Amino acid sequence: EIILLFLIEGYALDIIKFGIERRADGPGIDIGRQVSNAIKLLAVNIAYYLIPAIIIFVLGLFLRDWILTIISIILLIVFALANFMARCRLAKTDSLSDALAVGEAIGDISKVGIGKLIATVILVVIIAIVIMILAGIIGSINDLVGDILFGIALVYLIFFYHRAIGLLYSNV
């Protein structure tokens, strides 16, 4: 099961790369490369969520209540957006060090445009919700058809989401 998740994450990185390159085709399956990409993505995700967690923990020793909550939310949003950019940097360069360059990833947010980035994320989430609701409605009629449709919808959404991120980053 973990290997399958690694394959999906590695394939998603290839989808981002194809989006950045504005290629019309889809990436092929290369298990070795995709597992390697997934391990790199895991390192990137740990780094981009560990940094704000440590900062929030340290600030929590000194700050209390609402100010810590506001700072925490801002930090998590900034690092989540930077994580999007880090994924794109990893897909584009295949370099873990480029992806872990936090300052440059944060700088890429302004190159893409924070409004465009947030609007894309919101649009993708809305589309995903609509598709999953439709799959759920159909699934309530027939379990087997619903399960099959849910699987197809999930694969499509993974492809769509990562393609959108790649296309967004293609102008950087």
Model features per residue range: what roles?
Residues 1-20, 63-99, 138-172:
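Selective recognition of hydrophobic, aromatic-rich stretches within alpha-helical transmembrane segments
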Residues 52-64, 130-142:
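Juxtamembrane "helix exit" motif at the C-terminal ends of alpha-helical transmembrane segments
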Residues 3-61:
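Selected alpha-helical membrane-embedding segments in polytopic membrane proteins
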Residues 29-54, 81-133, 169:
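Interfacial aromatic "cap" segments that immediately flank transmembrane helices
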